[in-house]
Design a protein with these regions (language model features):
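Active-site-adjacent substructure of cysteine-protease-like catalytic cores
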Residues: 154, 158-222, 258
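Catalytic Cys-His active-site segments of thiol-dependent hydrolases/isopeptidases
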Residues: 216-235
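Bacterial Sec-dependent N-terminal signal peptides
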Residues: 1-23, 134, 138-139, 156
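Stable alpha-helical elements in mature extracytoplasmic
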Residues: 58, 63-70, 148, 152-156, ...
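Serine endopeptidase catalytic core focused on the charge-relay Asp
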Residues: 134, 138, 148-150, 159-163
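Residue-level detector of functionally pivotal "anchor" positions at catalytic/ligand-binding pockets or at interdomain
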Residues: 242-280
Length: 303
């Protein structure tokens, strides 16, 4: 069963972006992850008794899965900020400020064999995302209020230190189709995946990631279903089984804070003889996966 989102529409929508970005002809999918909501992703989520009375981990929740995949793309932060408690279950408290996020051990896919360290790395991130957005955990589905006071935008800034300059939640009802697509293309051209939500009359709500678009203007969607159905779609989603085309909204402007060193965006790492570091200071021989790396005082976003 897909995760249900209890959507409140009290979102503040701005009609312009603070930053103008040149729109590219197309953007190849930015994400390499194909994550989901069950094991190992949910190994740190709370347990509830199943139909046999045995303890079972709740599902991650699609909001947390989408947030986690976007954060993994940015490989940020190295360490969280402060402490947070789930208002719907006050026994769920996370000390973000004491958590080092182990990006190096988060795998793009967990279909094949993986280590305990790799499982813990992704499970920690996704559980922390869930607590940050006040996830209501369940065995069949985990849900949250996408426009709640402590929603995704608040969580990204408060607990994970993302730049709040252009970060906002916007509702499609405030835009024409052309304006909406322009926002999408601008963010993706800037290397900023989008967290997207919509409702279906037959399946409830879902939150997923937009991470690219093709030359025909179709948007690449990562649904958070272990790679299933990932592909290019018209934004109107008039597709049986994927018709999350009601009350669409999105979180745009998701990026780490600017630094004085600047950021260089590239599709491949420069020469192999330079020294590379991850954001948390580990030395790597050469970046072999997408993410953010530091070399000679500059940050490189490898696409």
């Amino acid at each position: 069963m897909k995760t249900i989102i209890l959507t409140l529409l009290a979102v503040v929508c701005l009609t312009t972006t603070a930053q103008t970005t040149a729109v590219k002809e197309h953007v190849d999918p930015l994400l390499t992850t194909e994550w989901g909501q069950d094991a190992p992703y949910n190994l740190l989520c709370p347990e509830k008794p199943n139909s046999q009375g045995e303890p079972q981990h709740c599902r991650v929740g699609c909001v947390a899965c989408a947030m986690g995949q976007v954060m993994n793309f940015h490989q940020y932060p190295a360490v969280g900020i402060g402490q947070g408690t789930n208002i719907f279950n006050t026994s769920l408290t996370v000390n973000y400020g004491d958590t080092h996020y182990d990006w190096a051990h988060m795998q793009d896919s967990y279909r094949d064999a993986y280590t305990d360290e790799e499982a813990t790395a992704v499970a920690t991130l996704l559980y922390h995302c869930g607590v940050a957005v006040n996830m209501i955990y369940g065995l069949q589905s985990s849900s949250t209020f996408t426009a709640f006071a402590n929603n995704m935008t608040t969580a990204l800034v408060r607990y994970f230190g993302y730049d709040d300059t252009d970060l906002k939640s916007v509702s499609r009802s405030k835009y024409t189709r052309a304006e909406w697509l322009q926002l999408i293309y601008e963010n993706l051209s800037a290397g900023q995946p989008i967290i997207y939500s919509g409702n279906s009359s037959s399946m409830g709500g879902h939150t997923w990631v937009l991470d690219g678009y093709d030359r025909e203007g179709r948007v690449h969607m990562n649904w958070g279903w272990l790679g299933r159905d990932n592909g290019y779609y018209d934004i109107d989603l008039n597709i049986p089984g994927l018709d999350f085309n009601q009350q669409q909204s999105m979180v745009i402007g998701i990026r780490p804070p600017h630094t004085d060193t600047g950021i260089v965006r590239t599709t491949a790492a420069p020469a192999a003889d330079v020294v590379w570091h991850t954001l948390d200071g580990r030395t790597v021989v050469r970046p072999v996966r997408r993410g953010i790396y530091i070399s000679n005082g500059k940050k490189y976003v490898i696409h």
